[in-house]
Amino acid sequence: MGMLEARELLCERDERTLFSGLSFTLNAGEWVQITGSNGAGKTTLLRLLTGLSRPDAGEVLWQGQPLHQVRDSYHQNLLWIGHQPGIKTRLTALENLHFYHRDGDTAQCLEALAQAGLAGFEDIPVNQLSAGQQRRVALARLWLTRATLWILDEPFTAIDVNGVDRLTQRMAQHTEQGGIVILTTHQPLNVAESKIRRISLTQTRAA
């Protein structure tokens, strides 16, 4: 039994099948990239795995239990960062981290922002930051979270090369410590091929 399992997932949108019969099992320490063309259902699959959406058929299990039966404990173990940063634009970068990680002290939050490349921007309201900087505020949570499972939709959007390298190193560290990372990205991952598992979506199935 793996930590996260997709079992015979079917997803249809506008009378079109995005994928069907999609099954896979993820174990501790896995780093997974969901690939496929635009419209293949990558974001849809991520939302199914978070429990934000339900499949038309099949189920997602966490540690052998259907998500709807273990929703609270699952979400305690999940960090989800979608296309939208999901941050409070009227708050500062530092206030955002305090909001999401109430048990994190100020020093930890400042260090997380520094790791994300936001040193010097801690006290600026997020609505005054660039799109890339706003994305970094959300991604700074990677240095604070205790969640086992990270699901990240295009985390490198609007991030420069150095930022991508830092984020990639943080993901590698998380998986080396037994965590799971699932992401979509159009950018090449600068890591050994042996470290990445790819699940490729076609119109009707996963390869």
Curated annotation (Swiss-Prot):
Any idea of its EC number?
7.6.2.5
Concerning SMART domains, the annotation shows: AAA
Reaction(s) catalysed by this chain's protein: heme b(in) + ATP + H2O = heme b(out) + ADP + phosphate + H(+)
Q: Which Pfam families match?
A: ABC_tran (PF00005)
Reply yes or no: does the keyword Cell membrane apply: yes
GO CC terms in record:
ATP-binding cassette (ABC) transporter complex
Q: Name one GO molecular function term.
A: ATP binding
Where is it mainly found? membrane
SUPFAM superfamilies to which the protein is assigned, alphabetical: P-loop containing nucleoside triphosphate hydrolases
Localization annotation:
Cell inner membrane
Q: Which domain of life is it from?
A: Bacteria
Chain ranges of the ABC transporter domain = 4-207
GO BP annotations listed = cytochrome c biosynthetic process; cytochrome complex assembly; heme import across plasma membrane
Which residues take part in binding ATP?
A: 36-43
Membrane topology, as annotated, equals: Peripheral membrane protein
Identify the enzyme class: translocase
Record bears the keyword Cell inner membrane: yes
List the keywords (alphabetical). ATP-binding, Cell inner membrane, Cell membrane, Cytochrome c-type biogenesis, Membrane, Nucleotide-binding, Translocase, Transport
- What family name appears in the similarity comment? Belongs to the ABC transporter superfamily. CcmA exporter (TC 3.A.1.107) family.
Instruction: State its role.
Output: Part of the ABC transporter complex CcmAB involved in the biogenesis of c-type cytochromes; once thought to export heme, this seems not to be the case, but its exact role is uncertain. Responsible for energy coupling to the transport system.
Binding partners and assembly: The complex is composed of two ATP-binding proteins (CcmA) and two transmembrane proteins (CcmB).
- The protein in question is named Cytochrome c biogenesis ATP-binding export protein CcmA
Encoded by which gene? ccmA
